[in-house]
Amino acid sequence: MITVFTPSYADDRNTNAQNLTVKEVVARMDPSRFRVVMLGAGVSDPRIAGRSNTRVLPWRKHGNTARILLHLLTHVPDAYFFPREGPLDAAFLAARASLRLRSALVTYVVSGGLSEQSDRPILMRAIREGDVVAANSVHMSRTVESLGGRDVRTVYDGIDRRYYYPSGERKIQQMRLTVLFAGSFRHYKRADLVVREAAKHPEVDYRLAGAGEEESACRQLAESIGCNNVNFLGHLTALQLGEEMRRADILFFPSEIEGHPQVLGQAAACGLPCVARNSYQPDYVVDGMTGVLAGSDGQLGEALSRLIAEPDLRRQMSAAAAKHAAKFEWDRVTGQWQEIMECAIERRSQSRRK
């Protein structure tokens, strides 16, 4: 039996992208081969709560780093999966090195905007010291290799088919088109550009799903420029987001800094053509076939205007997007992770014998 610890949350209501990934993987891992220990601050995902050989360590208001580190030192896991960048990760990496713990380090890199100048010492250490390092797109894998990662693998995030799937019936042509944005309201997500594009197309409805510190500024912008075709939806559950995607006609995602955003895969699975930036080279979007990847604000706006004006192009891209999204399956992804865990443990064992 292999014991895997991950500093990820089992909570059912936690929709952080990294935690969503781990929950999907853990829920599918073979319980006869893998015992999993993870964190919990609320009610667990029922699939994880019902999984045998699974333990959820409670995350409390105080003292978590010391308490959980003590657990890891007295119950040393075979693998430490998906380190983050908090004090627990820093403490464990230090203990692993100084005590030469048997725990294999399986590093998964998913965040964009990385460079040699990035002030992220915990992540950089996890990349350098990982027994196996993986990233969530081809572009991210190349980036991580440039930062010192060795033999970096590409492991995509899958798509949760419980929530993200095409409409079962042919979409009825609506009187007004709908453009959807989904993401946190942070400066780099560029929700402000969604509002500005909405002002150019008053005949189209724009729906923005998400919450964050920039939401108030975006609401004020919409009011100041007289934009009455914008609807702010707030934070949505996965079920609600899937429903919004099936009602929409286009996903407009102008975010500037990304790793490989799951929302693009989710939208594709719902048959939505996507307009996004080409800077992070998302594999969920095939440029010119399932959507459009653009390099500037102006090019994003041009691509969006073209999709709004050309219904035949939207239909072609919609069908191609749903077909392309079928490649991203969680069962296959979980199989990759199980093989990676075993490989990392063997590598760690060999390195400790030297």
Model-derived features: positions:
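Conserved donor-binding/catalytic core segment of Leloir-type glycosyltransferases
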Residues: 3-5, 172-189, 195-201, 207
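A short, histidine- and acid-enriched strand-loop-helix "catalytic/donor-clamping" loop
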Residues: 9-10, 88, 103-119
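Short alpha-helical donor nucleotide-sugar binding micro-motif in glycosyltransferases
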Residues: 127, 235-236, 243-248
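Carbohydrate-associated surface elements
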Residues: 139, 158
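Nucleotide-activated donor-binding/catalytic signature segment of Leloir-type glycosyltransferases, i.e.
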Residues: 219-236
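Aromatic "clamp/platform" in nucleotide-sugar-dependent glycosyltransferases that forms part
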Residues: 256
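Short hydrophobic beta-strand element within catalytic cores of glycosyltransferases
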Residues: 273-276
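Conserved acidic donor-binding segment of nucleotide-sugar-dependent glycosyltransferases
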Residues: 287-298, 306-311
